[in-house]
Amino acid sequence: MIVCAASNNAGKLKELRRILEQMGHEVKSLRDLCIDLDPEETGTTFAENARIKAEAFCKASGLPTVADDSGLCVDALNGAPGVYSARYAGEGHDSAANNAKLLREMEKIPDERRAARFVCSICAVFGDDDIVQCDGACEGTIARRLHGQNGFGYDPLFMVGERSFAELDGPAKDAISHRGRALAALYEKLK
């Protein structure tokens, strides 16, 4: 099946493409489809924002569309940055600024209170009344410094055991990540 991967985030698009193509789908990016659209994410949950994006891009592309909304939820910060993960340091800031803010916020938090999880909600829209939603999560901890060169976003700070997401190669990350788990659940539902 040809699928529109509804993301303007290069890192997410790379993961969506890698996982969906392994599932046998041909993935078209927004750039491939010449779609220049940035729907406002007004939802208060990952699921609501994923659905907003999936519906908008399905309508624009005319193709079955898979969108995700995901982020980092840190226990010691009452779930922050959560749905505001991409904008944690403010509008117009990048991953480096978000990571720097997270490190500042976590500076005095002891090791035993550094639990966090990446959360992902995937929404697949095939038409007006044909919508499938799945979620995935990955438990970990927040490091005290950046680790690794792979990945994107908060990956250099998110530790699973002794390694950060940014120290894992793509297939190793996909096997345990929030996005990999959400897409695996979607695959099972679609079978």
Q: What residues fall within each predicted segment?
A:
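Anionic-ligand binding patches
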Residues: 2-4, 10-29, 33-191
